[in-house]
Amino acid sequence: MAGRSGDSDEDLLKAVRLIKFLYQSNPPPSPEGTRQARRNRRRRWRARQRQIREIAERILGTYLGRPAEPVPLQLPPLERLNLNCSEDCRTSGTQGVGHPQISVESPTVLESGTEEQC
């Protein structure tokens, strides 16, 4: 871990050991029992795995000082999006699919049958 101090490395190793311990404390469910019992055990196991994953993200987020997930990109509403493919999209061969362009105007094909009154 180049560029880090020894204390920082030790803290990171402690965090990783803690996360490893959390995952090891939740072994996969046993395959015995009725179908319903197995299903319930798997459901509870998945819920615990989800909780462990969230705790691990919080531990690493606290250690790293930033969230694990990037900030989501703000997009316009889906009703206003459509694909507008130019001529180079229809080329065949090994050139790929081209570069589709995203238009933000509402197409007339997707509009509802009712007309809006002004």
Swiss-Prot record:
It holds the Pfam family REV. Gene3D superfamilies: 6.10.140.630. Keywords: AIDS, Host cytoplasm, Host nucleus, Host-virus interaction, Methylation, mRNA transport, Phosphoprotein, RNA-binding, Transport. It is found in: Host nucleus, Host nucleolus; Host cytoplasm. A motif (Nuclear export signal and binding to XPO1) lies at residues 73-84. Homomultimer; when bound to the RRE. Multimeric assembly is essential for activity and may involve XPO1. Binds to human KPNB1, XPO1, TNPO1, RANBP5 and IPO7. Interacts with the viral Integrase. Interacts with human KHDRBS1. Interacts with human NAP1; this interaction decreases Rev multimerization and stimulates its activity. Interacts with human DEAD-box helicases DDX3 and DDX24; these interactions may serve for viral RNA export to the cytoplasm and packaging, respectively. This is Protein Rev. It comes from Human immunodeficiency virus type 1 group M subtype D (isolate ELI) (HIV-1). The lineage of its organism: Viruses, Riboviria, Pararnavirae, Artverviricota, Revtraviricetes. The gene is rev.
